[in-house]
């Protein structure tokens, strides 16, 4: 049986000590903020109570349209933009991958923003540098949800967007069970959103856990990327096979039944790691997603990855 990703033992111990009053969680807040600023190369950062609250803060600061990808994003983008009564523009993508040139076809108002995830559907790295360059040249603010891309050793993700935000809930790369953050070089973002920030303040327990998890972010992301790459190399028809990702998506007309069978044969001790599509958060075509990002790092050994590959082959998903 596979193990679902949870906060590390050290993280849980620190959070427990903060909860019991053995150590002061408030002492960790500034340390967390400094680590986030260093990871994102951004001058200001705030810790929040959830990833969705980070999105709420970011979108609250935008006066123009909110541009969202047609798939491969996060459903909270649209839900929160609607709640804030923002005009939403849907951007055509290549199965989740953003081609900045497609924005030439859109009628976009001033002071608008594009919000997207570091990995399209978790399976394919976005060209964040090209996206940021296009948007900067056209007066569009970029908001990157780097929940799955924070700590990129190649410095391509979670660095160059105007606003970087993330969830730190399970089973994210920074995993403390809940919480999130938002970072930017534009101080006006935070001046405009003082009320949402007050309403989404995280607990001291989160500060303690996050401070510990931030120390392992780069290593944890790299382990996940390497495991995903290993599986992709052994399968012939994965989506965006040449891109880095933290899951593996395999298109198939009978995705629903195959996905069900895989769930029976690839069980975890908690939530699963098989997702079926169509699914806005992945791709809007029939497919099965193997959520490597959901697995505990101890499960990312070759023996376990070979078991996943074997079950995929047996299921005729290839």
Positions of PLM-derived features:
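PLP-dependent enzyme catalytic core of the Aspartate aminotransferase-like
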Residues: 1-10, 280-318
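Conserved N-terminal alpha-helix of the aminotransferase class I/II PLP-enzyme fold
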Residues: 2-53, 71-79, 217, 228-229
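Conserved PLP-anchoring active-site segment centered on the Schiff-base-forming lysine
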Residues: 58-106
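Active-site phosphate-binding strand-loop segment of PLP-dependent enzymes
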Residues: 95-163, 170-173, 186-188
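Glycine-centered flexible beta-alpha turn that most often forms the glycine-rich phosphate-binding loop
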Residues: 145, 269-272
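Conserved core segment of the aminotransferase class I/II
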Residues: 173-236, 259-260, 266
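Short, conserved charged micro-motifs
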Residues: 190, 254-263, 296-306
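Conserved glycine-rich beta-strand-loop-beta hairpin in the small C-terminal domain of fold type I
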Residues: 225-229, 239-266, 273-274, 278-288
